Structure formats: C-alpha cells, structure tokens
C-alpha cells in the first residue's frame, strides 16, 4: 500500500496524528520510507512512544498480530503510529511510505507453534483462520458488520 501524508496547511490540533496507534493484522509488514522523513513511532516496553530512527533508505520490519499468535506472545505485534512532523523544524513536510503486508492464505490455521509452548504451558490464543482473524480485525476497527456477514464473507472466500 502506498501512503501519502500531505503537508500541513494549518496548525495541528492537540493530539492530532497522521495515523493513530495500531498493530498490523497479518504476520509481517515491510515498510519503506523516504530518507529523513519519518514520523513513525513504536510503543516501547516502558509504554513510551519512541521515534523509529531514520538513517539511509532502509526497510523496516514490523511483526503483526498473526506472528504474535504463532509464537504464543514471545514475539510481540508492534504497536505503532505516525506522528506529525515537528512544526518548529519543517511544518510543510509531506510524508510518503510504501508498505507490504504479508497475510497468510485465507484458510491458513493460525495456532501456536509447538516450539513456542513450554512444558505445562498452554496456548494464549485460540486457533483461528487467517481470514477470520482479518475479518474480525476489520469488524472491530473499520467495518460495521455482524457475525453472520463475517461467516458469509468466509464462505465466499473458501469457494474462490
């Protein structure tokens, strides 16, 4: 997905962001940004928003929700957001990025990998298909659909 965040044409509102806090739905995201034009921040273990360092053109790898489920929470889905540019330094800065989201096949079973469960430990997450997880996340963040509609969408995708 190509993302374009236009330059600000007026001062931002308090707390305004270019993209609010979220984790990615799939297993992994590859992100490419313009050199020196970040704004990307991650929530660190101390629960503080931390800018992602921007050096030369580079690829940023974010782990997504399904990777967290596969690893039983050993690898964490990265909570991130895109902040506004520093209005003192460059208020007219636009930002572009290119993201590749890896989403396993619709019917792929997402369950804890055996190597990620210690003896006596149980899986933290229930088994789900990749498609069901995607639809549940869309439902909770974007779409206004009920469970029967989610089931219809799943059924339609199975037949394609």
Give the location of each predicted region.
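C-terminal flanking tails of non-heme Fe-dependent oxygenases
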Residues: 1-160
């Amino acid at each position: 997905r190509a993302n374009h965040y236009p330059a600000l044409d007026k001062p931002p509102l308090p707390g305004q962001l270019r993209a609010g806090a979220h984790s990615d739905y799939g297993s992994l995201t590859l992100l490419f940004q313009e050199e020196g034009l970040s704004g990307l921040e991650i929530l660190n273990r101390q629960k503080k928003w931390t800018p992602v360092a921007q050096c030369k053109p580079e690829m940023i790898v974010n782990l997504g929700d399904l990777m967290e489920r596969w690893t039983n929470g050993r690898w964490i889905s990265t909570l991130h957001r895109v902040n506004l540019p520093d209005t003192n330094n460059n208020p007219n800065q636009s930002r572009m990025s290119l993201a590749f989201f890896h989403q396993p096949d619709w019917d792929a079973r997402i369950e804890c990998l055996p190597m990620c469960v210690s003896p006596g430990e149980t899986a933290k997450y229930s088994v789900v298909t990749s498609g069901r997880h995607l639809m549940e996340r869309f439902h909770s963040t974007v779409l206004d659909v009920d469970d029967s509609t989610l089931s219809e969408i799943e059924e339609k995708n199975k037949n394609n």
